[in-house]
Every structure is written in C-alpha cells, then in structure tokens.
C-alpha cells in the first residue's frame, strides 16, 4: 500500500470511525436479520462463503439474509434462493454508496458481517450510515464501529464460520454450494460426448494478476510435458479474453480441446470442472470450485503465507501444491510429478 493511500485511509478512519449508535451485543442472541458486505467479492469469494447462506436458513428459515454487491458479481447471488435481498452498489461511486446505505438503513439489520482485510473510506462510510445493531469484522480491533471482532487467522471459510458462531447460529455442513446453469450443463455434456472425452484433465493457465498468468512458451511446455507423460485428453479452460489464444495453441496438439464458444461464462467452467478427472490451475476461483465439487487438483500458489492461509484449497480430495516466488512462469512443468497425473 503506497503512502498516499495509507494517509487517506488514516484520515478517513479518524473522521468516519465512530461507534455504532446502538451497541448491544445482546441482540445477537436471536438475530432476525444479517447483512453481508460483498461489493469487492470475486467468484472465489462467493464459492468459499456459499455454505453460509444455506446454513443460516437451515438454522432458522425466518432469518432475513441481505447481501451488498455490485452489478458485476450480482449474478452469483441472484441464483442463490437462500438470499432474501440483494442491494447493488456502483463500485468506486461514493454517492451511490451513500444512496444505497440510506435505503438499507431503514431495515435496521441486526448483524452486519464484513470480513474484508482492508476497509476503504467508502466502505467505512457505508457501514456507518447503515446503523446496524451489531458489526462483526475480521482483524478490526482498532476500529470503533465494529463491536465484535474475529481475531483468529485461518481460511476465509473459517472466518465466516466464526462470524456465524458469534451470531449464535450453528451449522452442520460447511460444504460449498457450487452454482449451476441447467442449460449450460447440457451443452457441456454434449461437448464431452461429441469429443469422446473420458477422464480428461482440465487446465487453467490464467489467474488474476500478471504474476499468475502463464506465457505462451510455458503453456506449450506444460502441454507437451503432460501429453508426453500421460496420453490424457486435456481441456483448456478459457474466458472471452483468452479463447482465441488458447484455441490457437490447442490446434498444435492432438487431443487438446477448448470449448468452442468465445463467450464462455463461469458456468461453462464449473461444468467442465465437474466432469474432469483432475484440475490443474493457477487460478484460485477454479481451485475453490474444484474443492466444492471434490475434484483432485494440482495448484500453483505464491509463497505469500498470509494469502495461502486465507485461500488455500479447502479440499478433502488429493491436492498437490506448487509454490512460486515472484511469477508462476518460474516453475518448470517437471515439478509436476508423473504420478500426480495418474487418474
């Protein structure tokens, strides 16, 4: 974090960080409504927290669940029948944050849960306007607005479980709810049938950020190594941005496929992972999807210990992890042991 940004956050905290007007943890004994802040959440964040909404409704179907999110990630929450209210905010638009917060304020939520590590000034302003009865934060002991704080480090699924425990909500099942689209599910099954795919390996060569993207030379090296080690069929997971590039690479090989649609969505990726025998991925969102679907994995993670603690594969299936220092292209494909590819 640069010095100017840190200074802005410090000033914002000094101005905005006030204790909530009603600071009464006793109301957590029987909460009737919970609000989750997910405006910065990505696909992996949703998957990791997906069980929470289900378990709240199992505990008490009458508890109201609200989610604050953006238009970009709303499609994930809109398909979850356990969520009662979705409130949209325009990212980085402080006026829209104020407008939305004033609207939600009328609901007087019993509990607001915000697990984010870095609290931006617009987020802090939103929290203050909400005027909820209780605020549960993660590592927010130095914030006045949070009257309840989770201090224990762990996987973010554990952070959410801790928030539920502090809300006196018990859970019985922490398995992820992986969403699906029935029409796309049929499309992918047809693709698998048409290409006679059996025990195929799904590979995601692109993560979030330039340090987690394989370059073309390394992609070709990995594909060559995997095909030479085992003659498995391979399916490369693409997005609209990577479709043409990966399709061109795939034509250099036999039995390497890209789903033939330049407008693929996360639901195509989910179904390909659901049907694969093994996932190889540098992208944490697909790692979390594979965890939820109980697929074996080979994953690439940086040596950032805090990031790994929060976002490691939370899987009961076989999972092999390769760590890189600065850039995933440091890793030789030969670090994938041949026996890991026995499927």
Q: What are these model-predicted stretches?
A:
Residues 1-343:
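Catalytic machinery of carbohydrate-active enzymes
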């Amino acid at each position: 974090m640069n010095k100017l940004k840190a200074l802005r956050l410090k000033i914002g905290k000094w101005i905005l960080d006030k204790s909530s007007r009603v600071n009464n943890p006793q109301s957590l004994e029987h909460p009737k409504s919970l609000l989750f802040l997910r405006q910065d959440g990505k696909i992996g964040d949703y998957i990791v927290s997906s069980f929470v909404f289900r378990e709240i409704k199992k505990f008490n179907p009458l508890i109201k669940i609200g989610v604050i999110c953006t238009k970009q990630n709303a499609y994930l929450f809109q398909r979850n029948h356990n969520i009662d209210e979705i409130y949209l905010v325009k990212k980085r638009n402080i006026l829209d944050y104020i407008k939305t917060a004033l609207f939600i304020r009328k609901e007087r939520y019993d509990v607001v849960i915000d697990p984010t590590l870095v609290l931006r000034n617009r987020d802090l302003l939103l929290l203050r306007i909400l005027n909820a009865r209780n605020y549960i934060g993660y590592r927010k002991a130095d914030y006045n607005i949070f009257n309840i704080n989770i201090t224990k480090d762990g996987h973010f699924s554990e952070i959410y479980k801790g928030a539920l425990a502090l809300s006196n909500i018990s859970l019985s099942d922490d398995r992820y709810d992986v969403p699906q689209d029935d029409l796309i599910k049929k499309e992918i099954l047809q693709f698998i049938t048409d290409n006679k795919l059996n025990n195929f390996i799904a590979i995601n060569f692109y993560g979030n950020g330039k340090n987690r993207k394989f370059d073309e030379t390394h992609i070709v090296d990995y594909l060559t190594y995997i095909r030479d080690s085992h003659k498995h069929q391979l399916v490369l997971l693409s997005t609209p941005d990577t479709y043409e590039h990966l399709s061109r690479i795939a034509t250099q090989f036999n039995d390497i496929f890209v789903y033939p649609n330049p407008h693929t969505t996360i639901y195509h990726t989910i179904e390909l992972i659901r049907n694969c025998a093994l996932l190889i991925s540098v992208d944490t969102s697909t790692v979390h999807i594979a965890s939820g679907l109980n697929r074996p994995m080979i994953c690439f993670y940086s040596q950032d210990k805090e990031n790994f603690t929060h976002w490691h594969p939370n899987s009961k299936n076989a999972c092999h992890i390769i760590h890189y220092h600065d850039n995933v292209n440091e890793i030789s494909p030969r670090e994938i042991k041949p026996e890991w590819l026995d499927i």
